[in-house]
Amino acid sequence: MEESMEEEEMLTYEAMMDDQNHNNWEAAADSFRQPPPAPPLPPPPPPRPSSSIPDPGRELPGGQLLAVHAGSMERKGPKEGLPMGPPPLPEPNGVIMMLKSCDAAAAVAKTAPAPTSSSTININTSTSKFLMNVITIEDYKSTYWPKLDGAIDQLLTQSPGDYIPISYEQIYSCVYKCVCQQHSEQMYSDLIKKITSHLERVSKELQASPPDLYIERFNIALGQYMGALQSIVPLFIYMNKFYIETKLNRDLKDDLIKLFTEHVAEKHIYSLMPLLLEAQSTPFQVTPSTMANIVKGLYTLRPEWVQMAPTLFSKFIPNILPPAVESELSEYAAQDQKLQRELIQNGFTRGDQSRKRAGDELAYNSPSACASSRGYR
């Protein structure tokens, strides 16, 4: 009896479970068959208040679209226009499409505000600042050129190796500003006049020199001027690059060397050359370094002057004379012998040509020297 009752209870329990599962399956199937309920529609937007908040979807003057949901404007916090409530419900399709058309852009462009007076004021301010930096011709003559004039004076009159208390950076900056302000032509003209006046004064001083000091003073003037060019040319490099080379098709260094040639060398070459030839015939009347500096300097100024004294120039500059030929060897030997005789006549003796010094033979032949030499062996 008990077993039969237990079996009936088990069957009843299984039947109840089958009915419950069947009901669940039918409910699930019905849910798949029926479409989902539509989401609730958002509440209608309230009337727009009269404030500075732009309309949703309205294009700003900058060309950007501002999309603001109406629900986000219903509640306002401490500051106007800040959304404080919950986020709005999404649209049925989940996407907000914003298209910008040409007509809308044109309409916004027409309604854009005109440029205010502040922009005009800014432009005028920048223009006035630029005009304040303009260097007029009066500024150039009263401020900039006096600085350059004083520096050029010091460079032209300095001795080799002297220290000049001038600011190369300041002079370089003055030249740069004058070139940028279109004063290159005036500055080049002033530079040429300045150096020409200096060279004319140097030429007059050389003319008043006595013959025994003429060569030495010419050497000092030549070396001083060439040394000054090594500083003047770099200081005026902007003028040389943007005016002399571009418009005049010349070079500043060549122009300044030409000035010395025209105002000093050409006026004194016919007085200087006889003195150089005379000094050459008398050994050590002029130091070799002075003679070499003058001869090389004259060749740099004008190579055609070699024809005035080719033998003199050939002693300091290579490849001046034509190459030697075998038929002239006897003549070369005669010239060397003549030079040796002249040296002997001026007190230069040949002396002992052996390799031993005076007293060496006596020292080596003495017994002490022999004993010491054996000791080192």
From Swiss-Prot:
InterPro entries: CACUL1, Cullin_N, Cullin_repeat-like_dom_sf
Pro residues biased stretches: 34-49
Keywords: Cell cycle
Superkingdom of this protein's organism: Eukaryota
UniProt region (Disordered), positions on chain: 1-63, 347-377
Gene Ontology molecular function terms on file: protein kinase binding; ubiquitin protein ligase binding
Gene3D superfamilies given in the database record: Cullin Repeats
The keyword tRNA processing is annotated on this UniProt entry: no
PANTHER family: CDK2-ASSOCIATED AND CULLIN DOMAIN-CONTAINING PROTEIN 1
Family assignment from sequence similarity: Belongs to the cullin family.
Protein name in UniProt: CDK2-associated and cullin domain-containing protein 1
Native species: Mus musculus
Underlying gene: Cacul1
